[in-house]
C-alpha cells in the first residue's frame, strides 16, 4: 500500500466542494508587504498605528464581532461605522497613550463560499500604555496571546474585513489595565 505525500483537501460534507481557498485568494488575503492593500496586513497595521481612515476603507458594511470569549458582547451585524466608533474610542484602541503591535503567527484559511473566508490566526498583541501622549514614559505593559477567527467577504473583487472572534490563551503583565474601558473602578482597586 502506498501513501500519497499530498494531504487531502477538506471538503464540505453537504456539497462535496472544497473548503480550500484558491492560491490567488491566499496571496490576496495574506500578503505581508507594507505597501499592500490587503485586509489581513492592513487590519493589523491600521490598528497598531491608529490609522483609522485606512482601517475604515477595508471594512465590510456589517461586521460579526464576537467578544464573548473575552467577557464582552457579541454583535451579529455591527455596522462599520459602529465598529470604527468602538475601536477608535479613547477607552479602547484610540487612546493616544496606548501603543500596540499585532503580530500574526500561524494561519490557515477556510473557504465558506466563493465570497466568504474565515482566517484562523495565532496572534500576539503587545501593548504599552504611556503616562502622556508624548510617549516618553511607560506606565504599564500588557500583552495578549490569542487565536482569532477573522471573517472576510469579497465585494467587487476585493476582500474586506467582516469581523472577528478572539479567544485569549493567556496574558502577560497588566493587560487588564491597558484599556480604560476594559475594567471597572472596583476592579482597579481590588
From Swiss-Prot:
Substrate binds at residues 67, 148. Transmembrane segments: none annotated. Keywords: Lyase. The active site is at residues 102, 127. GO terms for molecular function: scytalone dehydratase activity. SUPFAM superfamilies: NTF2-like (SSF54427). GO terms for biological process: melanin metabolic process. Its EC number is 4.2.1.-. The keyword Lyase applies. Homotrimer. Each subunit contains an active site, located in the central part of the hydrophobic core of the monomer, which functions independently. Belongs to the scytalone dehydratase family. Scytalone dehydratase-like protein; part of the Pks2 gene cluster that mediates the formation of infectious structures (appressoria), enabling these fungi to kill insects faster. The product of the Pks2 gene cluster is different from the one of Pks1 and has still not been identified. This is Scytalone dehydratase-like protein Arp1.
